[in-house]
């Protein structure tokens, strides 16, 4: 018959559990009086990593891992088959190689920041009674006194019956993340996170850097092909097929980021988020509609360029939910 576990065994087991909970926290526990990231998974749809430093959304379709693979795979192929030859060529293409690696690293960092950072999550009201007062079902309309081009425009405050809070203007509730987000633009399945006030700039940087990385990859491989063909090397010889593959890969892959980047530049120039734009056109197909400046938009106070800078460079603001606090 086995005896009771010793004190050292109990301490070792508890330390192991704490380490795994620090490494990845999937299911929270409201009874644990430790840090917020150990409790929040039970109230939201988040998974926390490394003691609440990184976070992701629970999903059965991890498209963000596919995007991560699409980012890493061309860099590996380029490093193995192309970089060495271009670096040591007598024509001096070292600058293009360095620029590609810089754009690729920028793209990977921006993707990571977009996917794992806080988009502007608002804390829930956990002290509210389950029965919502009847007056909370009414929206509150306030005058917007900025004196902009929108004239006597107004902003609407809505009560979130899930989070039990009054949402600030431009904030919306995400049904995937199960939380309200400041200046909520949309929930992006490709980064598995919401795009909001605190990570919108990272999202735009990801689109821009991905476009630049694809363009530089095409330039590097095209120069290799051009030089090889002029020197009489057949394309069937190694490693030229890899250069052709990377050119086609980058050309196809850059289409979506270019379209999204142009779309968000137009949206930010008119001071609209994706949710506001879709609501203004009745949630119809946005491809069939031209992005126009809305006259009733209280936030479009300046010209196109100033509006774009105001939305893209909007202050991130302090984090409403610090996941590492007790």
From Swiss-Prot:
Residues 1-62, 112-202, 263-326 are cytoplasmic. It comes from the Eukaryota. This is Palmitoyltransferase ERF2. The gene is ERF2. GO terms for cellular component: endoplasmic reticulum membrane; Golgi apparatus. Residues 84-90, 224-241 are lumenal. It comes from Candida glabrata (strain ATCC 2001 / BCRC 20586 / JCM 3761 / NBRC 0622 / NRRL Y-65 / CBS 138) (Yeast). Pfam families: DHHC. Coiled coil: none annotated. It is a multi-pass membrane protein. It is found in: Endoplasmic reticulum membrane. Signal peptide: none annotated.
